[in-house]
């Protein structure tokens, strides 16, 4: 499996890198080759997810793959939503994000499967699992009165805002508004410039 890669068909049991199986285990099915700006290449395979991630990786030395390393990172070992790992050190990286309760939105660059064709690096906004977001378009941005969207409009998907606030090139959409719900508190967000 580690030497073969395939894209899984889209359905409710596939997670992009693996398939859900009875018993709550996601088993890996896809091998990724990661290319870094410095020219390093790593082969990466998530073997399974069950209360944490078990994965394999190997570095390309210019002529062949080095010895395969296997690691397991358990969830819940620190106060963070994400697990971080360094191929350079071969270990989990601690304390790279604020505590779970200390953030709502992360403005960052991330990769998405753009237009169902390819992985594409985007600039956008990811949300904490502590909030839900509703996207309304068209809506007047600069207004002193508004009505919050219906409860069913809110999503916990991490990339609800994502890159949808702007076209691939140019200024943000002038008629897009996001409602962010945290508990019983609502925030209204819209973008006015890009860059």
PLM regions and their residue ranges:
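Surface-exposed, beta-sheet-biased, low-hydrophobicity segments with strongly acidic/polar composition
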Residues: 1-195
């Amino acid at each position: 499996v580690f030497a073969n890669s395939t894209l899984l068909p889209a359905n409710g049991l596939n997670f992009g890198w693996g398939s859900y199986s009875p018993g709550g285990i996601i088993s890996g099915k896809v091998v990724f080759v990661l290319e870094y700006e410095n020219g390093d290449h790593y082969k990466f395979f998530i073997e399974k997810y069950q209360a944490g991630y078990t994965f394999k990786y190997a570095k390309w030395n210019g002529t062949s793959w080095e010895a395969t390393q296997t690691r397991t990172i358990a969830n819940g070992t620190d106060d963070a939503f994400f697990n971080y790992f360094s191929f350079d050190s071969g270990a989990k990286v601690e304390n790279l994000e604020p505590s779970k309760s200390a953030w709502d939105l992360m403005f960052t660059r991330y990769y998405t499967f753009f237009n169902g064709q390819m992985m594409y690096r985007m600039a956008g906004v990811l949300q904490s699992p502590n909030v839900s977001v509703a996207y309304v378009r068209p809506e007047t941005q600069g207004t002193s009165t508004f009505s919050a969207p219906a409860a069913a409009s809110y999503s916990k998907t991490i990339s609800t805002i994502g890159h949808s606030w702007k076209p691939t090139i140019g200024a943000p959409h002038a008629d897009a508004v996001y409602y962010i719900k945290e508990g019983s508190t609502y925030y209204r967000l819209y973008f006015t410039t890009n860059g």
